[in-house]
Amino acid sequence: MLETDSKASKVGSKPKQALLIAGILFIAVNLRPALASVGPLVSTIRESTGLSNSMLGLLTALPLLAFGVVSMLTPLFTKRFGMAATLAGALLLITIGILTRSIDLVSTLYIGTILSGIGIAFGNVLLPSLVKRNFSSNSGLITSLYSSIMAVGAATAAGISVPLAQNEAFGWRGALAVWAILSLAAFFIWLPQVWRIKKAKKHRNFMKAMKNLASSKLAWKVAIFMGLQSFAFYVILAWVPDILQSRGYNASYSGWMLSLSQGTGSFRLVTYSFVGR
């Protein structure tokens, strides 16, 4: 049975542990589809809306801007609302954002992208902390599980976005909107944790913590490394399908190639398991 940190909220029985893990995995699977579903449809969106490459570049960059801003402000939200409630709010933001960008307006395409990007940013920041707090003795296993689920979510979204968009019942807006079903389901699965996971009692001063980080050489090195890694990842996520299509491959094939590149990330579960031994 997985053991939880005694200083964290007590998960208790196996069913409650299983529900918490399920909630974590459902949050994880929602942190990539809203992003991965766009890349294969860039050409379709361009043809439908008349947006230029620079405007489409802005569309794919908005979530990254949200990540940078929200990541720094997340401690303020967890201090006020607690980690579980903040994650619940993040899932609602993802859902609202996905639905908003499916409205037949160019402006809502950008507004919805920003909203979903903010929600994803909260999830990116809080999931590792949540796992470390509640499963300190099994954090490697849980981390590998949710990391693999994230890769599966990205691969699935990248692969089926074009087939959905080519279906007259969906279109490209419907292909983007369909992921709101998954994020809304995750919200209801996670909701019980809002009452079960207690807020941490001790908090460091936000400004003092930021000053300490700003003066840390190690923090800057890690930030630069992770920033470059994320830059490469999201460029691939957003533009590889369009590049392949410009080389003569059809949209469906390009989407599945992106899906393959993301799906290989699920093998990290096996890698982490061996490393853990």
Indicate where each model-derived feature is located:
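Juxtamembrane intracellular "pre-TM" segments in multi-pass secondary transporters
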Residues: 2-14, 195-222
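Extracytoplasmic
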Residues: 19-53, 71-74, 236-241
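Small-residue (Gly/Pro/Ala) motifs that create kinks and tight helix-helix packing interfaces
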Residues: 42-43, 74, 153-166, 241, ...
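Conserved MFS/SLC helix-loop-helix module at the cytosolic interface between two early adjacent transmembrane helices
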Residues: 69-107
